[in-house]
């Protein structure tokens, strides 16, 4: 887009941050990274931004830098220093505040905005695009460069803060939920009619047909009132130290107190993704001392394996072992200087250099972890001792409290990025890459076949998974953690596909060189780790574990690792129970025979040893193999075979067991339906839940087979991978490009497919066919997304899930859930059982939508859903804003807000998010 006739005026924002005038930097900014803001025609029109009447003339707009969580740029609408001072003063007074997170409405579209009250007459066509900057691959895209004057003195306050607080307690109507889910779930005939309407509308803009429902949806907040009852936390209070944020230069950080230093770091975050990932890793690692201890012990483990193996190989004279009685007699003096020479010594020097680098990295990690400790302790008011028991939901709650106090005053961090600080946004930032990997493995994009006929597909191993992450994710995403925008251009497909092929082949070559050393190291590591376990408990050789592919198949979108690890750990007993239900008669017959033969030899040797215990034990049965050696080996074989024989009786109900197991694994393919009792389903499940010894052997074999897969097989999938990242990426304001399957809250209304098939921005025709794209989505992909959506709801809305990383819900009464509620019972009986029903009826979506049950009989929080509340609540919605501070103004409003989402429009299943979910659940097998 060309801009002419504008003099480059002074840019206050750029001059403050970079020390430059706008004309000095105008040639360094790509216009595709700017967004159009229409100028006001009438500044008195409630502070709204009004578009020029000429729809085709876009030169009247002002191009603004995109706000980005990974940069240090500030929201251009709030760049002026005087405006910032005004906002700071407005916190302590009743002055008016600009709501920068307010969505802009499309032209000629009038609707009510909630929960801020009615705002009619807002006419808008485009919205500010915030979230992700251009990547370092932008030199592949030919763009014009321009810079326009900022919107100084163009925006008037929209609402008073006291009006906002008052509105939070009021119910609102006509709340719109996620249009993305709406498109997925509503009937096909409705989709077709909607598509026709869009095709007939010449001025349709898919990015602006939404309200501010994102601030009302349950996904944008966590029920802080619930968690506060279990875990008393002090709210962050940083308003007294705000001057530090604006006035302290980085070179004087050492003069600050620990709390002020933590505040400065928070206010000057230049990459919110990396910061939240560090914060989550700190929570996952249980604090400063646990993380440092783990890192130190990892280095010591590496040193121990290499030192012991080298010492046993070069410093022991095994020829003297039979005749020696002391260790000093078989030890070789000065073995490292005399025996170790040439290539082996060179490898040891390389290893020592690697250890030195790890120690240096540990030093810098300690500094970063210490900074995170200060952030948790002083700003979130959470000590390290609490991290092992406190729920993650409380961490989110404290982050949102902190954001409410700091987002409007920080002068470096992108304000819009912090305004997206909610449960859904935080999960998307932490798992930006992992969400793509989940979709990549679930959609079977990768070709993992071994390039030899009749070998079939190679199981995914940790070694192969690590190489895929290095080759694919390390190239698709830039250093800031954002997807390179060249991958979103269809015209750049061949270029990036060729680059991926080169990376696969290079990685295969490096694996061939490193495989001998890796095989040696991991053989020793597994030997030291598992030998004593199998020696003392031989029956453990039949233990099973989930394979790496199973972990990616079972994991949900936006499911943080500690939640996934907990439910997978709880599923192990049920998985073993399911496998053990199937008879293993052929295996039992073979194991009994092996047990008999080995036991017989052990018995013979033991009886002969009684005649001459001192000499016979050293008697050589074969060359250099004594009786004691064979008694040890054959005894171990007997213990393993005898312990692996199945002698217990089990109740054979594989269908019930597998359905119960699916409550934890979230995996129950439609192809297994009506075949749960068959050997075929059992074999498919055992490929996901395999013997631990088999998994270990595959890992060792993978060190040899991985180079061939990287060299010959995976390059064939390069083009499909580029298509996958382009088709699976959507743009969300304040988040940037994320995996489309991980966007399922109210913010999905703001999702924009920024690029079309020709590499340009989306057109009206592209938007009109968006419905057809949704219809063409694979059923499994849609089910996976919907399943993740409902489990995300359960994780963050269910009282019982407000637990720490190592805690599980206590057993509760399930009598009401296990029995069908009989509406024909007498009123007296219903009154007697009312308290039992309230105690037993804890909410989960699986219970609420269980076939034959009535959703209205289930409660949420402290609110019981019944017919009376259905008639009284009407069309209330969850009017909770992103801000926890503002969401707890009125106890009455809090009580209604906790349950109103589920009360809304139950009697019309085609309206509202939960109605759509209910309608979808009736027609699918998700989660059953």
Curated annotation (Swiss-Prot):
Residues 508-528, 693-713 dip into the membrane without crossing it. Phosphorylated by ATG1. ATG1 phosphorylation is required for preautophagosome elongation. It catalyses: a 1,2-diacyl-sn-glycero-3-phosphocholine(in) = a 1,2-diacyl-sn-glycero-3-phosphocholine(out); a 1,2-diacyl-sn-glycero-3-phospho-L-serine(in) = a 1,2-diacyl-sn-glycero-3-phospho-L-serine(out); a 1,2-diacyl-sn-glycero-3-phosphoethanolamine(in) = a 1,2-diacyl-sn-glycero-3-phosphoethanolamine(out); a 1,2-diacyl-sn-glycero-3-phospho-(1D-myo-inositol-3-phosphate)(in) = a 1,2-diacyl-sn-glycero-3-phospho-(1D-myo-inositol-3-phosphate)(out). Residues 317-345, 610-625 are lumenal. Residues 28-118, 188-216, 755-779 are annotated as: Disordered. Residues 90-99 have a biased composition (Polar residues). Phospholipid scramblase involved in autophagy and cytoplasm to vacuole transport (Cvt) vesicle formation. Cycles between the preautophagosomal structure/phagophore assembly site (PAS) and the cytoplasmic vesicle pool and supplies membrane for the growing autophagosome. Lipid scramblase activity plays a key role in preautophagosomal structure/phagophore assembly by distributing the phospholipids that arrive through ATG2 from the cytoplasmic to the luminal leaflet of the bilayer, thereby driving autophagosomal membrane expansion. Required for mitophagy. Homotrimer; forms a homotrimer with a central pore that forms a path between the two membrane leaflets. Forms a homotrimer with a solvated central pore, which is connected laterally to the cytosol through the cavity within each protomer. Acts as a lipid scramblase that uses its central pore to function: the central pore opens laterally to accommodate lipid headgroups, thereby enabling lipid flipping and redistribution of lipids added to the outer leaflet of ATG9-containing vesicles, thereby enabling growth into autophagosomes. This is Autophagy-related protein 9. It comes from Candida glabrata (strain ATCC 2001 / BCRC 20586 / JCM 3761 / NBRC 0622 / NRRL Y-65 / CBS 138). The lineage of its organism: Eukaryota, Fungi, Dikarya, Ascomycota, Saccharomycotina. The gene is ATG9.
